[in-house]
Regions:
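Outer-membrane beta-barrel proteins
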Residues: 20-26, 67-69, 81-87, 204-210, ...
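Flexible, surface-exposed loop regions and adjacent strand-edge segments
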Residues: 27-37, 87-97, 212-222
């Protein structure tokens, strides 16, 4: 704590580091399924999480005379958490590991953009090759989910095996709890009257959008992210690589275009 200018200015600054152990977790991944637990897997005190950050507050109070006063204040809190130990086993690839990630982190695929018609044509030519020629000709892109067309989302093949699958998922989203929260404001006083304002903000909070937030006309137009950005979409006439909506398709996500409904960086906001 620090006070200056006859205690008009007050500064409080704290640094913290916490290691929390014996966190109760359900052991649904670390116990083999052949043991018969299934959804009734036992809990165990096996989790370890580390938090570190800082907290600061600055406040200035000034009385100019018997009528006028001014108070200015600001605060900021920063916290970064990460898994040290948990119930997940070590993964095949480093990018899949939970440890070192924040506790609300979400996995998904890395989107590299939208497919162009040229890329789709290149894949069609590659598919028409004989097996011998395929072995010596690089595959234009990794196999995605179902049959993809121009305007569909293209995902990154992290392990370079030519197939997008669970081994290409990595942590892409921190979750909806921000790492930083801040605020500032003032209060101006005159006799028995006062005027105050306060501003608040957050930083580094993310969410993977799904459901009605990414499906135009979801619920018959009564719900869904429809009116604000319906024109911000990929079309053959407007092949915008940065469109909010990739190629639109008709029907349920599981039968019509499963590729564009995968959790990915394309949907992180």
């Amino acid at each position: 704590d620090l006070k200056l200018f006859n205690d008009d200015l007050s500064i409080i600054f704290d640094i913290f580091k916490e290691r929390r152990e014996n966190i109760l977790l359900k052991r649904e991944n670390s116990i083999p399924s052949f043991l018969g637990y299934n959804t009734s897997a036992p809990y165990g005190n096996i989790g370890i999480v580390e938090n570190k950050g800082f907290d600061a507050t600055v406040e200035y109070n000034k009385r100019f005379n018997k009528d006028w006063t001014l108070a200015i204040r600001g605060n900021i809190t920063y916290n970064k958490d990460k898994w040290i130990e948990g119930e997940l086993p070590e993964q095949r690839y480093d990018w899949m590991n939970q440890y070192g990630q924040n506790i609300l982190g979400k996995k998904g695929y890395i989107a590299e953009g939208l497919f162009t018609q040229a890329e789709i044509d290149d894949m069609a030519r590659w598919e028409s090759l004989s097996q011998a020629n395929k072995a010596t000709t690089p595959k234009p892109f990794a196999s995605q989910f179902g049959t993809v067309k121009a305007g569909d989302i293209k995902y990154k093949d992290l392990n370079n095996d030519g197939q997008i699958d669970a081994y290409d998922k990595t942590y892409i989203c921190r979750g909806d709890v921000p790492t930083m929260v801040y605020g500032f404001g003032f209060t101006l006083g005159w006799k028995n009257l006062s005027l105050g304002m306060m501003f608040q903000g957050t930083h580094d909070a993310e969410r993977i959008m799904s459901g009605s937030s990414i499906q135009p006309f979801n619920g018959g137009g009564g719900s869904g992210n429809l009116y604000s950005n319906i024109d911000d979409r990929w079309t053959e006439d407007n092949p915008n690589q940065n469109a909010f909506y990739p190629r639109l398709s008709y029907g349920a996500e599981t039968s019509s275009n499963i590729n564009n409904f995968q959790p990915s960086t394309w949907r992180v906001r």
